[in-house]
Each structure stands twice: as C-alpha cells, then as structure tokens.
C-alpha cells in the first residue's frame, strides 16, 4: 500500500510539472511581456546602455524578436553565468538569451531545458598581452589563466592543456567582469572564453590595443536561446522566430520592406502570412513573421548592427555564421 502511495505521488508530481511546462505563452500573453534573461556586460551581445537605461546587443534583439512575434513587450533580466540556468529552470525568465553554449548535459533531461536553433557559431580562444610574446597555446606551459565559473570554458581549458601536455594554473571568478578585470590588471597571463566574447571584452580593456586574440580555437561553442523542457508550444515559437530571421535574409526581406514585401513564390507568401495558415499552427497571428522582421530585421541585419564593422567587427564572410548559400550553417527548414 505504501509503495502504491509513493508511485501515485510521483505520478502527480510529473503531471503537475508537465502542466506548468505548457503554460508559458498563456503567461506571457496575460502579463503582456516576455521576460528575457540576458548578459548586461558583454557589448555586442548583451549590455546595458547606462545613458539610456536600455539593453542592446545581438541576443537582446532576439528577445525583441520573440516579443514581436507574439505582440507583447519585453523585460530584460541581467544574469551572471552562474545564475542563468537556474533563472530559467525556476521560471524567473521565459527564455534565456545569454551567450550560452549548447551541450549534451545542458540539453539533457537532468536540467529540464531545451536549446533552440543556434544563432551564433563560436569557439573558445585566448586573449593575451602583446608584450608577453605568447603566439599560441604551445607557448603557455605553466601559464596562469583567468576563467569564469559556471561556463563550459573551465572544462575545455583543462582538456586543452592536458591534450597538449601543458602545466596549468587557473584563477576562477564568479562572473565575467571579475575574471576579465583580473586579467586586465595583469592578475593572470591570459583570459579564455568564446572568441566573440574575447572580441567584446577587449573593447572594455584599459588599453584595448595592448591585447591580441590568439588564432587557437580549442572547442565548438554553438550559442542560442534556451527554454524550459516540456512546453512544446513555446519551444516552437522561439525556434521559428529564429528561423524567421534566417528565412528573411535568404529571400531579401528586410526591416525596411517586410511590411510591403510581395511575391508570387508560394513559400514566401506563406512566410508573409498571405496564405497557408502558418501563424495558426503556432498559435500566432498570420503576419507574425512580418512583425518580427519589421521589429529587428533579418539575421544579416541583426549581425551587421552588433557584430559587423560598426560593432565588434567579427568577420562573417566564409564563417559558419554565413548563410548556407554562402558556405555557412545559417539555414531555415521548409516554411510549409
């Protein structure tokens, strides 16, 4: 009898968690805003403009895109690397857009999270001072490396030094500001993170020109949005919002022309909401994708605005972040 009672309680708990997982869209619509977890100190991806009080960046724009798809406002919550996953798990935020790497562990049933399509393909690297004459990882035997806790970079760093049979001394800090700050005042020989983050943080150094990013890439770091596991409706909305920005770039639909774009191409017409009932399949208005592009632009426009020559100046041509038609991995499934 006792065993039956325990099983019954466990089943009720599973059902309860499943029911909670299915209500994100309804909650967002009721409150009139989507709550997005972001980085507040990473220019180009997520940063707070102290002059305006507004968040800006590549990840921030994807939060705005999700809100535009639904027709609600946004609220941005700044999170450290250590806080981000818990904030999503506990329902503090609706979606996490904070330069977070897709890994098996993070995507497993243990954490209860799901990754949406990758928005930026990255890799871990190193930033060093020019004066130290370090040209590659091979020159770092016995180096002291600053790293942020709660990230994939800790494990990748240990693996890379072990693979190259190098001695390693690490200094681990709770957040990016502290870890990069320690490096910037010569508290360690180098700092390691995703290369996009290194490019961003270099702009915040006391003397940016004193630092170089080494050519070594020691990992694959696919970055993109995360949602809670079990809410398929919300997962689909976030997933296809990302795909909408990919599709729009491929077909020349921009922030400036989205509202008036016309075509005889059946797939484009489905995208624009002119036929096919695609919006209803997601529980959204038929012109939801038009609203997304009108709000933030297509993938290329978002990239150019924050990561292009006037932003972090991370080359896109020939990279994995180019469209699939140009040799990259930015690719939208069939819009049908």
Spans of model-derived segments:
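Positively charged n-region of N-terminal signal peptides that target proteins for export
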Residues: 1-4
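Bacterial N-terminal signal peptides
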Residues: 8-16
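Boundary of Sec targeting at the N-terminus
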Residues: 20-23
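Sec-exported extracytoplasmic/periplasmic mature domains
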Residues: 29-30, 67-75, 89-93, 101, ...
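Bilobed "Venus flytrap"/periplasmic-binding protein-like clamshell domains
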Residues: 35-44, 52-69, 122-178
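Acidic, polar ligand-binding/catalytic clefts
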Residues: 60, 64, 68, 73-139, ...
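Extended ligand-binding regions for polar small-molecule ligands
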Residues: 61-64, 68-69, 131-134, 138, ...
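C-terminal functional modules
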Residues: 274-336
């Amino acid at each position: 009898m006792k065993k039956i009672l325990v099983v019954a309680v466990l089943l009720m708990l599973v059902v309860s968690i499943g029911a909670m997982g299915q209500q994100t869209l309804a909650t967002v619509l009721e409150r009139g805003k989507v709550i997005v977890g972001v980085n507040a100190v990473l220019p180009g991806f997520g940063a707070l403009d102290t002059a305006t009080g507004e968040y800006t960046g590549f990840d921030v724009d994807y939060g705005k895109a999700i809100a535009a798809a639904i027709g609600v406002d946004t609220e941005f919550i700044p999170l450290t690397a250590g806080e981000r996953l818990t904030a999503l798990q506990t329902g503090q935020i609706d979606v996490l857009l904070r330069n977070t790497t897709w890994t098996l562990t993070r995507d497993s049933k243990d954490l209860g999270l799901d990754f949406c399509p990758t928005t930026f393909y990255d890799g871990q690297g190193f930033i060093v001072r020019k004066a130290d004459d370090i040209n590659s990882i091979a020159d770092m035997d016995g180096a002291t490396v600053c790293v942020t806790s709660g990230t994939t970079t800790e494990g990748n760093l240990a693996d890379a030094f072990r693979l190259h049979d190098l001695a390693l001394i690490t200094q681990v800090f709770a957040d990016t500001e502290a870890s990069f700050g320690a490096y910037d005042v010569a508290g360690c020989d180098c700092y390691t993170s995703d290369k996009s983050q290194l490019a961003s943080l270099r702009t915040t150094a006391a003397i940016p020109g004193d630092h170089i990013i080494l050519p070594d890439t020691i990992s694959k770091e696919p970055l993109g949005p995360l949602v809670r596991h079990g809410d398929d409706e919300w997962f689909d909305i976030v997933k296809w919002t990302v795909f909408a920005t990919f599709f729009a770039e491929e077909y020349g639909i921009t922030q400036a022309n989205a509202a008036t774009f016309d075509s005889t191409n059946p797939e484009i017409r489905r995208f624009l909401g002119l036929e096919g009932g695609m919006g209803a399949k997601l529980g959204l208005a038929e012109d939801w994708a038009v609203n997304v592009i009108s709000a933030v632009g297509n993938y290329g426009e978002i990239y150019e605005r924050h990561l292009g020559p006037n932003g972090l100046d991370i080359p896109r041509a020939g990279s994995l972040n180019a469209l699939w038609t140009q040799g990259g991995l930015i690719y939208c499934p069939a819009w049908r």
